[in-house]
């Protein structure tokens, strides 16, 4: 069989198209996890503990910023958010850098966020760091593990 220059070009274009398709397809789950994280932030801003709890898997766990206790079921999660919304009225969250890794049906999002709330008529902030672990459940990414802690003061 005689080598044709156009077959080389065609192979190059097809290989490039395949690589592009793979990279675009692999970007999807990260964006889905980012969207699930943003949904958590938007839902938190509604200050409705029942809605926030629905974003966690039935066996979801929370080690929250405001509590020394791990919350390991939906009733305990709800209790945490009821308290958080009382202690931090008008609670909102703004996300900083997010480092998202996807491992099949599991994903981890690690980063920092800043909580904003109103106290004595004044807006206050609480910078914190977080890790969310998500598991894919059908079309939804559910939170199975969430750790959040106040950002430590810089060393002196």
Q: Language-model features: where?
A:
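N-terminal secretory signal peptides that target proteins for export/translocation
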Residues: 1-8
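Helix-to-beta-strand junctions that scaffold the AdoMet/dcAdoMet cofactor pocket
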Residues: 57
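A beta-strand edge to alpha-helix "cap/lid" segment located at domain peripheries
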Residues: 28-51, 61-156
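Bacterial N-terminal signal peptides
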Residues: 11-21
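Sec/Tat signal peptide C-region and signal peptidase I cleavage site
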Residues: 23-27
